[in-house]
Swiss-Prot record:
Domain of life: Eukaryota
Quaternary structure, from the entry: Interacts with LYN. Interacts with the SH2 and SH3 domains of FYN when phosphorylated. Also interacts with GRB2 and PIK3R1 when phosphorylated.
Protein known as: TOM1-like protein 1
Alphabetical list of InterPro entries matching this protein: ENTH_VHS (IPR008942), GAT_dom (IPR004152), GAT_sf (IPR038425), TOM1 (IPR014645), TOM1L1_GAT_dom (IPR027428), TOM1L1_VHS_dom (IPR047013), VHS_dom (IPR002014)
């Protein structure tokens, strides 16, 4: 830890320690060699400007020792002249000017008039700018604020010479108000102020009247228009007035620095304040416009996002209400099965069971008709093709042909078996030599130990063949 002090102490740094020693009250006079050494450290180190400004602020703030304040002001003047823009840009900040130097002008510090004038001269000179392009807007603001409060700044060293030169201006010379580029030659360290002749003052007042008119127009447009419902022509005019107002504000600030006329200075300050309010109002209006446009854009994107599905349509579930499928009752199904079982054996129509899905052709739905007809979709076997095919070759002529029935319920099966018709008389007599492949009926797997009332059907052709063989042997 350097010099036994905390890192938060501005005097703990190398340049801070040197500033503390060079501005100590025990020093008899300014040590210019030490001041130059401090300037070298500020220019050669990265944190030198920042550390130096912090140390100077600590030395001056709330210090009633006039000797230390005088030494500090001398060091500041030396650093401003010999250090670069990095130090100058920090020394002209409002934090240092207003919160440190201006507070020393308070009567409680009882500074000598010479020291007070030196502080005011610093503020006035720095507000005129630096050759390195340093931003001096904050020190200009402090300077104008002091002028508005009636603070009298001391005359510069070259002021008498400047007034004498201003009095020798030829009357034939144009009396236009100098613009900002023209003032660059006037704003010099040796000749920082000018005195205006009556013709120049009259021209300046006429231009200030134009600025006042522009301010009134800008204020009226801002009051009549609201962000989101503004008139485009008014906004275009407002934009032009804002650009012109910015340029006039720069000229007014330059004139305030160089003009040595109390009445003109007071009017310039008042016009600058009104113009600044109009400019700030336009900037606020523009920010509100941008905010409304951004909010509208966000709402549009949110609406578009909410209207789009979060997943592809193929991945979505169908939440539409399901229409219930009418299911025929059990009694109607049993009645239809019984009617089908009484048809001719030549019919191979399937027995209707309880199907959850209705027929795709309502006009052919067997449940909706009293006279049941065999659909053309199913092939029919007549007695003719029964004769051509050697069916039931292993049966006796008096054998009873079993019809395949629905296995839906035991009741339906029993009703179908009771209504089986006899074998038609036109059926040809089967011979012993005619062989027919065995017919297999539906066999269901079941547990013989499980209690059930359903009828079980199994292969019966093999049993009848054996029985017929035994009869033939006899």
């Amino acid at each position: 830890m350097a010099f036994g002090k905390s890192h938060r102490d501005p005097y703990a740094t190398s340049v801070g320690h040197l500033i503390e020693k060079a501005t100590f009250a025990g020093v008899l006079t300014e040590d210019w060699g030490q001041f130059l050494h401090i300037c070298d450290i500020i220019n050669t180190t990265q944190d030198g400007p920042k550390d130096a400004v912090k140390a100077l602020k600590k030395r001056i703030s709330k210090n009633y020792n006039h000797k230390e304040i005088q030494l500090s002001l001398s060091l500041i003047d030396m650093c401003v002249q010999n250090c670069g823009p990095s130090f100058q840009s920090l020394i002209v900040k409002k934090e240092f000017i207003k919160d440190t130097l201006v507070k020393l002008l308070n009567p409680r510090y009882t500074l000598p008039l010479e020291t007070q004038n030196r502080i005011l001269n610093f503020i006035k000179t720095w507000s005129q700018g630096f050759p390195g392009g340093v931003d001096v807007s904050e020190v200009k603001e402090v300077y104008l604020d002091l002028l508005k409060k009636g603070v009298q700044f001391p005359p510069s060293d070259g002021e008498p010479e400047t007034r004498q030169e201003a009095g020798q201006i030829s009357p034939n010379r144009p009396t236009s108000v100098p613009t900002a580029p023209a003032l660059s030659s006037i704003i010099a360290p040796k000749n920082p102020t000018i005195s205006l002749v009556p013709e120049q003052i009259g021209k300046l007042h006429s231009e200030l009247d134009m600025v006042k008119m522009n301010v009134k127009v800008m204020t009226a447009i801002l009051m009549e228009n609201t962000p989101g419902s503004e008139n485009h022509e008014d906004i275009e005019l407002l934009r032009k007035l804002y650009k012109t107002g910015r340029e006039m504000q720069e000229r007014i600030m330059d004139l305030l620095v160089v003009v040595e006329n109390e009445d003109v200075t007071m009017e310039l300050i008042q016009v600058n304040e009104d113009l600044n309010n109009a400019v700030l109002g336009y900037e606020r209006f523009t920010r509100n416009q941008q905010r409304l446009l951004e909010q509208k854009r966000n709402r549009t994107e949110a609406t578009r996002t909410s209207s789009e599905p979060s997943a592809p349509s193929c991945d979505l579930l169908d939440l539409s209400p399901i229409v219930p499928v009418p299911t025929p009752n059990e009694g109607a199904l049993n009645s239809v099965n019984a009617q089908l079982s009484g048809l001719s054996v030549s019919s191979l129509s399937p027995v209707i069971t309880n199907n959850l899905y209705p027929s795709l052709q309502p006009q052919r739905d067997l449940l909706a008709s009293e006279d049941i007809e065999i659909p053309t979709l199913f092939p029919q076997r007549t007695s003719q093709n029964l004769a051509s095919s050697h069916t039931y070759d292993n049966f006796h002529s008096n054998s009873v042909l079993l019809q395949p029935v629905s296995l839906h319920t035991a009741t339906a099966a029993a009703a179908a078996n009771q209504r089986l018709p006899p074998l038609p008389s036109s059926h040809p007599v089967l011979k012993d030599g005619d062989l027919q492949p065995p017919n297999y009926y539906e066999v269901m797997e079941f547990d013989p130990l499980a209690p059930t009332t359903e009828a079980v059907y199994e292969e019966i052709d093999g049993y009848h063949q054996k029985e017929a063989q035994s009869h033939s042997d006899c």
